[in-house]
């Protein structure tokens, strides 16, 4: 309630193992995923929780959840574990996303939280091992598995514009995924992939994506992203990395490496320049301005590092 200044423990959480992700489609209703294929649900904005789904025998974590509204959503996890609900979690049904025999971990799923257009509310995305990028147009009923040309793991992703997502991976790998029309000209130097729906309402519809690598100046893995109020994207990563990506105006990436070098797991914007960073150092406010001033000031005792690279 006070932009992260104070925190209180939830009154009731009937689960003692690791929780991995949270999705709150409305003010009071929230869902969280965790180990033992567990899904928790809150009716009061996170004050109290109940176990809504659990499969201890599966012995694998659910890693991410995205609720499109108070009724429909998907939860994804290790070994291609995929669940979907259409009734607010009263029941969760197994979902088929990828026929890869390797059963890649599905690390993160997200939607169009910015609402560029109404139909985008039905769109969903996911990323995982083997550089896989997944797209759905019907709230997770049917998915396209799209090859990106990257063989590492993507840990997170975010929709940054209509038809575009940033995919965040291992060792500082960031990929811009751009949707093209079937007859649109695509520069020959881009990695491209086409996939077609085999069932459902969109059966036979095909999508063409092109992928660009974006160098942000770090080899640390990137863990989470969110949009600032002015359209820039803030990224968090291991080793104290925080980056702000400006793809519209300055076309650059400013990266701060905090002096404690402790890893960041999540980021929440607080306007244009400030954001909350959560990770090994706890939860605290941070700003790129403060990092830059520490770096250039001769009197500063901070060991923060700051650098800037251009987006080609």
Sequence positions of predicted segments:
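Residue-level hotspots at or immediately adjacent to binding/recognition sites across diverse folds
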Residues: 1-312
